[in-house]
Structure formats: structure tokens, C-alpha cells
Regions:
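Polytopic membrane enzymes that build or remodel cell-surface glycoconjugates and lipids
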Residues: 1-448, 455-456, 461-478
Length: 478
């Protein structure tokens, strides 16, 4: 119910956004081979996942919204199972971490359902690999069955995309947390950890070698390496600044934006629904905590130790989450579209917040804090979905106006459009919609129409504002 209130209220009024338009146009208009070419230069294995899902679902936004909703929810379910295993006897605390993960406010692009459903699937694979490993630790008779399943899920995560790539190394932290109560000497603990980690470490090393020597045609190269050679001190200083900025962003700023109210024309009607969402989440989350089996009473020292382990694991996860972006010189942001990078931090951040709240000795205060954070974050996600819904309506109105006022747009036409009216579309996004509308029977790799933002393309893909000049623009598929 919390997932539905955060993401499902506008599910049938949302559409395709940003990279979704060109990817779906390439797949459904130009065919599966064109989609293979599109992913050939970056994430080819992830492209296979797109091939599979697009064979199942048509180019209907509502289907993809439901699809993404289910994967987002399933990810939170797996997080609950992981934390419940690591934090034994604390089901309420595990629920709190799962809910924080579900509605993490740093990432607000859930409405781009086609695109991010495939992110959620890969994240689900990573989380399932951790859960399978924990199951293997608890089931000696089925150790290898669970381990093989965990290795498979881990490989799918590592081979498909880079967002959760370095986060794979948090596995050693998960093992240490799971073993914390076992009576082992230091040597036995190290050997036990290495034994459990070694199969997954082998898969990680193989994937690194694959990216280095087999498929090294990455769109974004690791510029940090060359920068370290040319200016090591300055590069390390900037890297440290980027890391600190990112940590503040995902741990503090992401949550503070929950308190920012929207500046919209129909403010009252929007806020009425917003307050209803928050109130409903408060009731549902409170009921969930109260009806769930209460956390076991433990000594203060045991509570502090267990919660501290969870916080430590979260800190490790957050630190590892940023390296796929820091290595290529990207810094996460809360602005669109760069807040997509915060998705990889959601697991670690939810562990940190859940662990810190778990340090509080008073159960009622813990529940109040968790419910407050979850309800405000769910309300923020609803407001984000509404922004996307409004942008979809403006985009549809734009092309309705075009087909009404310029029904006979000739092939090989360049359309120039001022920026500012649309928040969640780039000009190459709109180019695909333009071709879908004006050239519905064109299934070749020759694109008949292109839409440019002059401020973005002038002096680049668009040499000058003149008629009859050749324009070369590549969609990778056409």
C-alpha cells in the first residue's frame, strides 16, 4: 500500500520520457536488430534484457508503469528479507529499512517506467544475490544450490550495467555482519569470510577482466586514471571533494527536499492530494509497525552493537556506491537527470538511517521517526510523479498542435524548438516522437526528421542556422 500511494496513484496518466522515447521507437519501429545496434557500444548484455522485456510488453505506457512498480516493490521485499536475516529478532527495524529503501527521495525518476524498470531488475538481481548467499550460510545441506543461484544473480548484475558494479564488494561487509555473533577466533573469522566470499569474488574479477580486455568499448571512459598521472594531487583533492559532496547529497540534501513544496498554479488541489497521501501512509505504516511482531527486547549494549553493525554496513555500501560515477568524473545531483545516480545509494542510505534510528532505546520514538520519514518521502514521490504527468500532457499537446498546424511536414526536415517548456525531455527524445508521428511506415535506418534545441546543437550537430545545409546525426540505430 505504501508503494501504491507513492507511485501508483497516477500510474495510468504517465507516459514515456527522456531516453525512453528513442529506445522504444528504435525497438518497436525499427525492430530488434536496431535495438541491438543501439546497445552495441555500451551495455550489450543489458540490451538483451530490453530485447526480452519488449517481446513481452507492447509500447503502452501503462503496462510499463505497472511493470516498473512491481520491480520497485519486489526490491523492497528483498531488502526486508536481507535486513531481517542480518538483524535477527528485529522485524520492525527490518520493515523500517525496507520502507526507507522503497521511497528514498533522492531518486525521483520512477515515472520513467520503461527505462528504470530495467534498472530495478538489475538492482533486484544484486539484492537477490546477497539474499541467496545468506540463505546458503543458513542452509548447509543446500549450500551449493543457494550459492550457484547467488553467483548467477551476481553475474547478471555485473555483466548488465555499471550502476551497482562496485556495490558488489559490499558482500564482504554483509558476510562480516552475518558472522558477528558466531564464536570464532580472528583467523577462523577471516577464513570463513574468505570461503564464503571467494566464489563471488571470482565472478567479480572475471567481469572486470571482461570489461578491460573483451568489451572495452565503453561510452564513458575512466578519466580519473589519466588525470592521476598528469596532476595527482589536484585530482585527489577534487575526488575527495566530489566524494564528500555526494555523501552530503545522498544522506542529507535528498531528505531535506521533502520539505520543499511545489510551485504550481493549482497549488491547493495538488496539496490536498499530497496531504492525503501523507496521512494515508502514516496510518498504513503505523499499522504495519504495530501489527508486526515487535522487536525482541535485548540489553542496551546488544541493541547498540547490532544497530552499529547495520550503520557500518550502510556506510560501506554508500562509499562503494559512488565509484562507478566518481571514476568517470560524474558527480550525482538532485537535479534531473543526474539524480538517477542516487539510485545506487538507496540501499546503503536506508541501512544507515534504519541503524541510527535503531540506536534509539524507545520503541514509540523509533516508530514515530520512521513513519515521519516514510510518509514525507512518499508524499515527495507523489509530487514528482505529478510533475512527470504534467510534462507528458504538455508533450502530447505539442505534437497535437504540430500535426494540426503542420500536417504535411516533408521528409528531411529539421525542426527547431526553444527549450524550457518540457522538463523531462531532451531534443533527441522528441526527435524519436517526431519520426514516430510523421513517418510511421519508415522502418529503415534512414531517419527522416530531426528536432533540435538550437542552444544545445548550434555549432555542434547544427553547424549554422541556414537552409539546405547537410546535417549528420546518429541514433546508433539509424
Amino acid at each position: 500500500m505504501v508503494a501504491f500511494l507513492a507511485y501508483g496513484l497516477l500510474i495510468f496518466r504517465l507516459g514515456f520520457y527522456w531516453d525512453e522515447l528513442p529506445i522504444t521507437w528504435i525497438r518497436y519501429q525499427l525492430g530488434s536488430e536496431a535495438l541491438t545496434r543501439y546497445f552495441s557500444t555500451n551495455r550489450p548484455v543489458w540490451g538483451m534484457l530490453h530485447q526480452l522485456t519488449t517481446r513481452i510488453l507492447p509500447q503502452v505506457p501503462a503496462y510499463w508503469q505497472i511493470f516498473a512498480f512491481l520491480w520497485r516493490w519486489l526490491g523492497a521485499v528483498v531488502v526486508y528479507a536481507i535486513v531481517a536475516r542480518l538483524w535477527k529478532g528485529k522485524p520492525q527495524s527490518a520493515l523500517g529499512v525496507a520502507l526507507l529503501f522503497l521511497v528514498y527521495p533522492g531518486f525521483n525518476q520512477n515515472s520513467a517506467a520503461y527505462l528504470y524498470s530495467h534498472f530495478y531488475i538489475v538492482l533486484f538481481f544484486f539484492l537477490c544475490s546477497l539474499l541467496c548467499m545468506l540463505q546458503a550460510m543458513d542452509s548447509p545441506k543446500r549450500y551449493w544450490a543457494w550459492t550457484v543461484a547467488g553467483i548467477l544473480f551476481s553475474a547478471l548484475n555485473l555483466w548488465m550495467m555499471e550502476y551497482f558494479y562496485v556495490l558488489e564488494l559490499v558482500r564482504v561487509g554483509v558476510i562480516l555482519v552475518a558472522l558477528r555473533d558466531e564464536s570464532l577466533t580472528l583467523r577462523e573469522r577471516i577464513m570463513r569470510t574468505l570461503t564464503l566470499w571467494l566464489p563471488y569474488l571470482g565472478v567479480f574479477i572475471l567481469s572486470v577482466l571482461f570489461r578491460l580486455f573483451v568489451f572495452n568499448n565503453q561510452v564513458y571512459g575512466m578519466g580519473l586514471t589519466s588525470q592521476l598521472k598528469s596532476a595527482p594531487i589536484e585530482t585527489l583533492r577534487k575526488l575527495a571533494q566530489s566524494i564528500l559532496f555526494t555523501l552530503r547529497l545522498v544522506l542529507k540534501d535528498a531528505w531535506l527536499q521533502m520539505l520543499v513544496l511545489p510551485d504550481v498554479a493549482d497549488f491547493r488541489s495538488v496539496m490536498n492530494i499530497y496531504y492525503l497521501v501523507i496521512a494515508a501512509v502514516i496510518l498504513i505504516a503505523t499499522a504495519g509497525f504495530l501489527f508486526m511482531r515487535r522487536d525482541e527486547l535485548q540489553t542496551t549494549r546488544k541493541n547498540v552493537i547490532d544497530a552499529s553493525w547495520i550503520v557500518g554496513l550502510g556506510l560501506l555500501a554508500v562509499f562503494l556506491s559512488g565509484w562507478p560515477f566518481w571514476l568517470i568524473g560524474f558527480t550525482p545531483s538532485l537535479a534531473w537527470p543526474a539524480n538517477r545516480f542516487t539510485l545506487s545509494f538507496a540501499f546503503g542510505v536506508s541501512l544507515i538511517f534504519g541503524g541510527l534510528i535503531g540506536l534509539i532505546p524507545w520503541e514509540k520514538l523509533r516508530i514515530v521517526l520512521l513513519v515521519t520519514l516514510v510518509s514525507l518521502a512518499a508524499g515527495r514521490q507523489y509530487l514528482s510523479a505529478r510533475d512527470y504527468q504534467q510534462d507528458w500532457e504538455i508533450q502530447k499537446d505539442l505534437f497535437w498542435q504540430m500535426t494540426w498546424r503542420a500536417p504535411g511536414l516533408k521528409p528531411n526536415t529539421l525542426v527547431l524548438l526553444n527549450e524550457g517548456a518540457l522538463d523531462y525531455y531532451a531534443d533527441n527524445s522528441l526527435s524519436s516522437a517526431l519520426n514516430w508521428i510523421y513517418a510511421p511506415d519508415n522502418h529503415t535506418d534512414q531517419i527522416e526528421y530531426v528536432l533540435f534545441y538550437p542552444t544545445t546543437r548550434l555549432k555542434n550537430a547544427l553547424p549554422e542556422l541556414s537552409t539546405g545545409i547537410p546535417i549528420y546525426y546518429d541514433y546508433l540505430a539509424g
